[in-house]
Amino acid sequence: MDNAALARKSIAYRKTILTIIKGANAGHTGGSLSCTDILNVLYNQVMNISPETANSPDRDRYVHSKGHSVEALYTVLADKGFFARAELDTLCKAGSHFVGHPTRKVPGIEQNTGALGHGLPVAVGMALAAKKDGRSYRVFTTMGDGELAEGSIWEASMSASHYKLDNLVVIVDRNTLQITGRTEDVMQLDSLEARFAAFGYAVRHVDGNDVAALSDLFAQLPFEPSKPNLVLAHTVKGKGISFIEDKVKWHHHVPTDQEYASAISELELSEQQLRGTHVAAASR
């Protein structure tokens, strides 16, 4: 899939995320929008994960450690055909499997998450199992930056480098906001590159809302032999809608009718602009 097609998918995904959160009157809007492009590129270009390979022992594994942003994951899994898009309209409704954090009851989800700090330890275990079993699969996990205050992240990181897990890809959604404010005000996170490098990771930076940059970076995996891979993905919380971007209130704010209509209008305008850019480029 080329970068223009990926960019169009990101816009479509954001529309779905807003729609299902509005319908459920619940959800984590900002963090779902910040990681949309990451999940888009992983599932559509990088990982060997599909409904057809769901039971293959050599499929890649994905663990969504920042489980509160599950609306983004549900949206991508529906698009990939793990379940019908219409099922997402039951989000957070009584009796639905589509609850506010990932569970293995939903097709395509490998691990229950939501208790922050647990996704990376599980991903490390999966990657170690692949090494011990002689399997070729890779393990990907996306963490929130606020999640890095959890001690289990650093315990797991020691293990990842000790066991030389170059089949592990850890992505930090570095949007600099968490539920109560700026990450730096809650717990200092300066020098993240140096910290992760000291724990033995091969660290790379990327614009986490640029599908082309993400595609180029993931094509370089593994970054260094015998080292776990760490991607500091610099993102904007609420990416794609001007009045949602970089606003702490949108951590789990549900859009009003007017906000929803305005957000969809902005995304549709972005769609038109992208289409116009693509047509202009093709005519040169």
Residue ranges of model-derived segments:
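Short acidic, glycine/serine/threonine-rich loops at helix termini
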Residues: Y74-T75, T103, S152-W154, T180-E184, ...
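N-terminal hydrophobic or amphipathic helices/low-complexity stretches enriched
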Residues: M1-Y13
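N-terminal capping segment at the start of a domain
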Residues: S10-A26, D173-N175
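Short, active-site-adjacent cap segments at secondary-structure transitions
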Residues: E71, L148-A149, L177-Q178, K237-S242
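Structured core elements
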Residues: V63, V169, H205, L230-L232
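Thiamine diphosphate
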Residues: G108, N112-A115, L120-F223
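Glycine/aspartate-rich loop-and-adjacent alpha/beta segment that forms the canonical ThDP
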Residues: V211-R284
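Cofactor-binding active-site loop characterized by glycine-rich and histidine/acidic residues
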Residues: I17-I20, S32-H162
